[in-house]
Amino acid sequence: MSKAKFERKKPHLNVGTIGHVDHGKTTLTAAISAVLTKAHGGEVKDFASIDNAPEERERGITINTSHIEYDTDTRHYAHVDCPGHADYVKNMITGAAQMDAGILVVAATDGPMPQTREHILLSRQVGVPHLIVFMNKCDMVDDEELLELVEMEVRELLSEYDFPGDDLPVIQGSALKALEGDPVWEAKVMELADALDTYIPLPERDIDKPFILPIEDVFSIAGRGTVVTGRVERGIIKVGQEVEIIGLRPTVKTTCTGVEMFRKLLDEGRAGENVGILLRGTKRDDVERGQVLAKPGSIKPHTKFEGEVYILSKDEGGRHTPFFKGYRPQFFFRTTDITGAVELPEGVEMVMPGDNLKFVVDLIGPVAMDEGLRFAIREGGRTVGAGVVSKIIE
């Protein structure tokens, strides 16, 4: 059948429902599945199967997440929904569910609640670029003014965290009524899908971003020079291009004189490929695992940053005891561990296993980083936490 083939050509986006407990995230997820599947085909996932989210492990952290897929006229979406607040925290910090956009669900009967605020803040911290709002349970509010008030409150809250609160789409609907097949409310789900299509820009593909390759191994090849191997994280590297070797020691510039994959010589290496890169005039001892090769000027090495962090619970194999100021674990970035000192925020004396917080890290050596880079926190090779760089300090 040629139809399925055509579908795959649609641009793909990752989205997810976020918001306060019992505001209707899972019901909305089921409603989107039902309404869009009716319109575009595909497999319907009902509320029970979404609510019964399977357990996954990401970097040793247990997360319950449901995944559904759906199509609109122009796009294909992968959508994640989590049953519990802790699952959202872990999901967003580990990047297990990278979101191009979040659908913030707010019950019109309640208005913004503590987790509404927390999820908006998390989205800002971990770099979810866009949010749109679905005001749910609007069938239960008769007062038009009350709906306007709730919408205004949500918009103000979003603006407080630097999202464009005045401009982003807010759809007033009822997930439950749409799920029950009421055409008036089904239309609101279609309106939400339309808002996703028109308001959320297509993310830049990895291949179009500036080249970067985290170095995993370094070899010396007699008569040819030094080869570094690793998986191209993003961008394209072509033979003859200049690259910088960044992190751990002073930045050096060199030229790529060869790209090989499975012992075959190539003209270029692309995002997602495992390649070996031959470097001109670079000695075996000038490069090490943990550095990155990157397009000159595209990324800088830093030692001090603010991270949004989740500390594993004892049950997840994390620490059994809290840690205090002066804590110095290793921070695993891309391919290597580097020691760093933790500065706890004002008023925080200790951090318990299972906690989520933001703190400042001072590394003993520079690492190539951008905001949004994920890392693990380790003690002697054992993962005890996960984090994301939310702000670079120096």
Swiss-Prot record:
Q: Which residues bind GTP?
A: 19-26, 81-85, 136-139
On whether Cell inner membrane is a keyword of this UniProt record, the answer is no
* Region annotation (G3) ranges: 81-84
Tell me what reaction this enzyme catalyses. Answer: GTP + H2O = GDP + phosphate + H(+)
Return the annotated region ranges for G1: 19-26
Give all residue intervals belonging to the tr-type G domain: 10-204
Keyword Signal on entry: no
Q: Provide the top EC class.
A: hydrolase
Output one GO MF annotation: translation elongation factor activity
- Pfam families in the cross-refs: GTP_EFTU (PF00009), GTP_EFTU_D2 (PF03144), GTP_EFTU_D3 (PF03143)
Location of the protein in the cell: Cytoplasm
Residues engaged in binding Mg(2+): 26
The segment annotated G4 runs over 136-139
Cellular compartments per GO CC: cytosol
> In this UniProt entry, which cysteines form S-S bonds?
none
Q: Where do the record's region annotations for G5 lie?
A: 174-176
Q: Which UniProt keywords apply?
A: Cytoplasm, Elongation factor, GTP-binding, Hydrolase, Magnesium, Metal-binding, Nucleotide-binding, Protein biosynthesis
Name the segments for region: G2: 60-64
User: Its Enzyme Commission number?
Assistant: 3.6.5.3
Assembly and interaction partners: Monomer.
Family label? Belongs to the TRAFAC class translation factor GTPase superfamily. Classic translation factor GTPase family. EF-Tu/EF-1A subfamily.
According to its UniProt entry, what is the function of this protein?
GTP hydrolase that promotes the GTP-dependent binding of aminoacyl-tRNA to the A-site of ribosomes during protein biosynthesis.
Question: What is the protein's name according to its record?
Answer: Elongation factor Tu
The scientific name of the source species is: Psychromonas ingrahamii (strain DSM 17664 / CCUG 51855 / 37)
